[in-house]
Amino acid sequence: MGRYSREPDVASKTCKARGSNLRVHFKNTRETAMAIKKMSLRRAQAFLKNVTDHKECVPFRRFNGGVGRCSQAKQWGTTQGRWPKKSAEFLLQMLRNAESNADYSGLDVDRLVIEHIQVNRAPCLRRRTYRAHGRINPYMSSPCHIEMWLTEAESGVDGAKQGKKKKKTDGVEKATTKRQKQ
């Protein structure tokens, strides 16, 4: 299966989904994909449904020229955001595909996390629009290829991360108490 840009580390605990030459804007889809990366499957599905309902926005970080500001982008630490409905619907359909692949493979669907998601440009499709004085201008579309894989999250990893955070906060508290004593 050489159609993916890279292969997962543990193939037995991974489910994949991909789409080629999808008629959805590349830039919007890239920003939406980066927003759901590292999310759990259920959270990503809820997020994409909220985007279509304008309850949560997609932060625009790279392709943000001319993008307006919205208050919903504050939760992402940025000011610019949009609600790309068609991109959200395409990614939601791909997540459903990956979920059915995971169910077929016997993976625990509730523990799936989006480990890898990548959006590439597909060849542009050319149409024409008619202008004044007999001129014709191109009317291009920017389709994209999307690939993703989801892996089962291990509960031990989450506990290890929380343990590290506690140690850091303990160190900060100790430092503040030493300063207060001096």
Swiss-Prot record:
<dbReference type="GO" id="GO:0022625">
    <property type="term" value="C:cytosolic large ribosomal subunit"/>
</dbReference>
<dbReference type="InterPro" id="IPR005721">
    <property type="entry name" value="Ribosomal_uL22_euk/arc"/>
</dbReference>
<feature type="region of interest" description="Disordered">
    <location>
        <begin position="155"/>
        <end position="182"/>
    </location>
</feature>
<dbReference type="Pfam" id="PF00237">
    <property type="entry name" value="Ribosomal_L22"/>
</dbReference>
<dbReference type="GO" id="GO:0002181">
    <property type="term" value="P:cytoplasmic translation"/>
</dbReference>
<comment type="similarity">
    <text>Belongs to the universal ribosomal protein uL22 family.</text>
</comment>
<dbReference type="InterPro" id="IPR001063">
    <property type="entry name" value="Ribosomal_uL22"/>
</dbReference>
<dbReference type="GO" id="GO:0003735">
    <property type="term" value="F:structural constituent of ribosome"/>
</dbReference>
<keyword id="KW-0687">Ribonucleoprotein</keyword>
<protein>
    <recommendedName>
        <fullName>Large ribosomal subunit protein uL22</fullName>
    </recommendedName>
</protein>
<keyword id="KW-0689">Ribosomal protein</keyword>
<dbReference type="InterPro" id="IPR036394">
    <property type="entry name" value="Ribosomal_uL22_sf"/>
</dbReference>
<dbReference type="InterPro" id="IPR018260">
    <property type="entry name" value="Ribosomal_uL22_CS"/>
</dbReference>
